[in-house]
Amino acid sequence: MTYLLKKNPFVANNLLKKINKLNRKAQKEIIITWSRGSTIIPIMIGHTIAIHNGKEHLPIYIMDDMVGHKLGEFAATLNFRGHEKGDNKSRR
């Protein structure tokens, strides 16, 4: 058995409390979080979580194939705009 299988997945306490509260009420509303390092666990399935990408919160709907991944994997932090077309400065 590997070391990581012995450890419990990390989920921020405030995020876990919000999800448990919504599950008890059987409500679906957007949960705002800055915790990109939290692991997606099965009780999160069906909820929409707004994950902070450094500038804004991106709403992500949690599906069953996302379980085990981190929240930050689904909110990209960089926007690649492509290389400049006429950039010949490095060709000297």
Curated annotation (Swiss-Prot):
Pfam families: Ribosomal_S19. Keywords: Plastid, Ribonucleoprotein, Ribosomal protein, RNA-binding, rRNA-binding. SUPFAM superfamilies: Ribosomal protein S19 (SSF54570). One of its GO terms (molecular function) is structural constituent of ribosome. Its main location: plastid. Signal peptide: none annotated. GO terms for biological process: ribosomal small subunit assembly; translation. One of its GO terms (cellular component) is plastid. It is found in: Plastid. The keyword S-adenosyl-L-methionine does not apply. Belongs to the universal ribosomal protein uS19 family. This is Small ribosomal subunit protein uS19c. The lineage of its organism: Eukaryota, Viridiplantae, Streptophyta, Embryophyta, Tracheophyta.
